[in-house]
Amino acid sequence: MLVLPEELREKLKKPFGKVYKTLPDIDGDIVTVGDIVTKTAIENNIIPKLSIFDLKTRRNIPVKINHVFKKVIKVKNPPGCISDEAIESIKYLSTINDRNIALLVDGEEDLLALIVIKYFPIGTYVLYGQPDEGIVVLKINKKLKQEIEEILKQFKKI
């Protein structure tokens, strides 16, 4: 399990890319991280390769996603952490050609975007919500992977 160190909290609150008020047109594989961004994508007829969510927004407000996923995988991931179970699931899902898969998180999903960037192929788009601002859209590239690798090295392994 990786634990977020206190000194990284502020850095990770800032968006890693451009923030959009509405979903831009995207041509490529998409991974959504977060309930509202997943719900928004699906409501706009965008079916992500992988959707990661916990059915809550703002830590405790229930969210309903009206969609039938091809497969739902459940993982535990405590707040402020990245569980080994979540890492292994994302690593596996990055290698398969399937789409419309849900990773339903018992806990908190926010930090899992880091693991998606680490393992998913270059060219994949990662979308996550930026509270009160909009949707952050990242296209995975070598530079972003290196930046995320440096951040993950600062996590505490327990």
UniProtKB/Swiss-Prot annotation:
Pfam family, one: DUF359
Pathway: Cofactor biosynthesis; coenzyme A biosynthesis
Domain of life: Archaea
E.C. numbers: 2.7.1.237
InterPro entries cross-referenced by the UniProt entry: GTP-dep_dephospho-CoA_kin
GO biological process terms, semicolon-separated: coenzyme A biosynthetic process
Catalytic activity: 3'-dephospho-CoA + GTP = GDP + CoA + H(+)
Record keywords: Coenzyme A biosynthesis, GTP-binding, Kinase, Nucleotide-binding, Transferase
Binding site residues for GTP: D35, I36, V37, D54, K56, E109, D132
HAMAP family, A to Z: Dephospho_CoA_kinase_GTP_dep
Reported function: Catalyzes the GTP-dependent phosphorylation of the 3'-hydroxyl group of dephosphocoenzyme A to form coenzyme A (CoA).
Protein name: GTP-dependent dephospho-CoA kinase
